[in-house]
Amino acid sequence: MIQREEIPLLLTGFMATLSGVGLARFAYTALMPQMVHAGWFSGEQVAYLGAANLLGYLIGALAAAPLAERMGALRVLVVCWVAVMLSFAACSFPQPMALFFVWRLISGIAGAALMVLGPSVAMSAAAPQRRATLGPLMFC
């Protein structure tokens, strides 16, 4: 049973994962055929946009811990949530390929950092005897 004081921890880990995977990574994957159909980009260009996001994921996963040490994990989480939101909004209208590439790269960096830091921050704040119960629920 989840205790009332654990709900913020559970939501932090869950929302970081949802934002990092759902919005930052996969939200635009489903829209890529429509972007081609609408004439925003060619099929080859959307492949590069996907690569930009994956490159961002690599950078973000490697940079998450050093950034958290330097800036504090909570601050990094907030900055990354804002970056995902801005990237999501910026990619909602046609713009030059290079700019879209940068936004997808930013989305990947921020998304990976959210996935790495969110659950670990939440779990470190949880009581040790409750971690085995709370951890799996963050990834439902």
Which residue ranges define each predicted feature?
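Residue-level signature of mid-helix packing/kink "hotspots" within the transmembrane helices
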Residues: F26, N53-L62
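Helix-breaking motifs and short loop linkers at transmembrane-helix boundaries and internal kinks
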Residues: W40, G72, F93-L99
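Paired small-residue
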Residues: A83, S87, A98-S107
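Helix-to-loop junctions at the C-terminal end of transmembrane segments
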Residues: G60-G72
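Membrane-interface helix caps of multi-pass secondary transporters
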Residues: A30-W40
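Cytoplasmic helix-loop-helix junction between adjacent transmembrane helices
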Residues: W103-C140
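Structural signature of the two symmetry-related core transmembrane helices
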Residues: R75-A89
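Pair of pore-lining "gating" transmembrane helices in MFS-fold secondary transporters
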Residues: E5-A30
